[in-house]
């Protein structure tokens, strides 16, 4: 009887551990503000054209891309699928001149396929970004 009770408790503990591990397996986007600005007349929103400087690294610190060496900002329309989901979500509500650090799980980056040869499948991405300019598109 006592052995049966111990096995039941052990089974419950293992089930709880498996459930907790599964919940942690799906990571969330992390957004850290590295530099705030005092004056922010407009914040980025879906449909805006953003001019960004960025440096992208893997979790181990290996740099895979950057706009800085060419001093050529990356320009794209926010929230329209032109960039990875982690950017479309992580750059909302930014001010011109603001800097952020984004830690993007693979589900919001390049997923299990990666972007060979520089980004392996399942990679978490770390971006340091700076919003240089917002072009607000007129609403239709």
From Swiss-Prot:
GO terms for biological process: chaperone-mediated protein folding. InterPro entries: FKBP2/11, PPIase_dom_sf, PPIase_FKBP_dom. The keyword Iron does not apply. One of its GO terms (cellular component) is endoplasmic reticulum membrane. Its EC number is 5.2.1.8. A motif (Prevents secretion from ER) lies at residues 137-140. It is found in: Endoplasmic reticulum membrane. It catalyses: [protein]-peptidylproline (omega=180) = [protein]-peptidylproline (omega=0). It is a peripheral membrane protein. Residues 1-22 form the signal peptide. The keyword Transferase does not apply. GO terms for molecular function: peptidyl-prolyl cis-trans isomerase activity. Keywords: Endoplasmic reticulum, Isomerase, Membrane, Rotamase, Signal. It is an enzyme of class 5 (isomerase). Inhibited by both FK506 and rapamycin. PPIases accelerate the folding of proteins. It catalyzes the cis-trans isomerization of proline imidic peptide bonds in oligopeptides. Interacts with ARFGEF1/BIG1 and the C-terminal of EPB41L2. Belongs to the FKBP-type PPIase family. FKBP2 subfamily. PANTHER family: PEPTIDYL-PROLYL CIS-TRANS ISOMERASE FKBP2, PEPTIDYLPROLYL ISOMERASE. This is Peptidyl-prolyl cis-trans isomerase FKBP2. The gene is Fkbp2.
